[in-house]
Amino acid sequence: MNSLTDWERELALLENKSNLRKLPVIRHLGREVEVNGKVMLNLSSNDYLGLAAYLPLRTEFLQSLIPDTFLPSSSSSRLLTGNFNIYVQIEDLLARLYRKESALVFNSGYHMNAGILPAVSDTRTLILADKLVHASIIDGIRLSAAKCIRYRHNRYDQLEQLLVSNHAGYDRIIIVTESIFSMDGDEADLRRLVTLKQQYDNVLLYVDEAHAVGVRGIHGLGCAEEQDCVADIDFLCGTFGKALASVGGYIVCSKTIRDYLINKMRTFIFTTALPPVNLLWTFFILEHLNSFSFRRERLKRISSLLKDALVKKGYACPSTSHILPMTIGDSGDTVLKADFLQRKGFYALPVRPPTVPEGTSRIRFSLTADITEEEIKSLIELI
């Protein structure tokens, strides 16, 4: 038997269930994309503020570069020769913005989530994770030595019971959640989680703000800023690769946690650092973050418009954010609906198992601030 036969059989099974993934060839045209010769409005991007598609901002940044600062590679890990001064500048700026002791930048959100929990956990650690946390967090949990219990999504009564029954049996308990959940677009009650955490001296709180940074909070710092609990979150994590139109992940935390991660976090230690030119762009965006409030407001308006329409048309839509699922159920039906919307000029993509549970395939509308209300109304007519 050919050693690839099992894999070929599994791929055929995925295709029969309409769950086979393929890489699309995409040409980006600002707010639009061209796929297979058809130009469509992009409703599947994480460019929530529309910054990646905004040419004047890129032009302003590029005009500030000179050959000495345009460094396309760090050529080393940060612990060797890759810790360029721009890293120090970004981490100092993040710490000031969040009013935290320190910050640490990572190569990606995946590196962040897959690396932090294994670094800070041992066999005397219990992780209590929301059932719907991102796959990168699940990978981090699996790589750790900790025991893990996943509580039902946003069910803090169950979480409280787990804390009551387990707090005395472990040296450390880490509650893990996202602030805005990537598939349903709903939110965690961070203040409630802080209240639960504060009842025990051995409980820490880990919050991934990947989908909230840039779009929530008066200064765009996320749901923790919006809910006024930044100071009470031990591991406050975010990414630059979504609303901030750059690359990388970060944590704002105590100096002790930062120093510990530098010494123990394998996905930080054993990787080449980000290129300095990318970090310069990140710093440029962070300096402008406070000026994007009008984009945050516009995103809020169009998100509310589409959410109301989905509910009126009978779709279960738990979202309270700019991520709006239209749950259809069957994978094949979802693919057909996505194809229909694409033929009408909207690049909306199906999300299928294993990304979401069987029977909950959906079209995930990922809105950006440069979409107009008229375009949303045209979309509504088609759904």
Identify the role of each PLM range.
Residues 7-9, 13-72, 203:
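N-terminal "arm"/small-domain region of PLP-dependent enzymes with the aminotransferase-like
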Residues 53-55, 63, 92, 96, ...:
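PLP-dependent enzyme catalytic core of the Aspartate aminotransferase-like
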Residues 59, 63-109, 303:
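Conserved N-terminal alpha-helix of the aminotransferase class I/II PLP-enzyme fold
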Residues 116-135, 156:
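Conserved PLP-anchoring active-site segment centered on the Schiff-base-forming lysine
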Residues 149, 153-207:
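Active-site phosphate-binding strand-loop segment of PLP-dependent enzymes
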Residues 219, 225-260:
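Active-site PLP attachment segment
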Residues 273-292, 298, 302, 311:
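Structural motif of enzymes handling amino- and sulfur-group chemistry
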Residues 297-304, 311-345, 367-369:
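Conserved PLP-binding catalytic core of the aspartate aminotransferase-like
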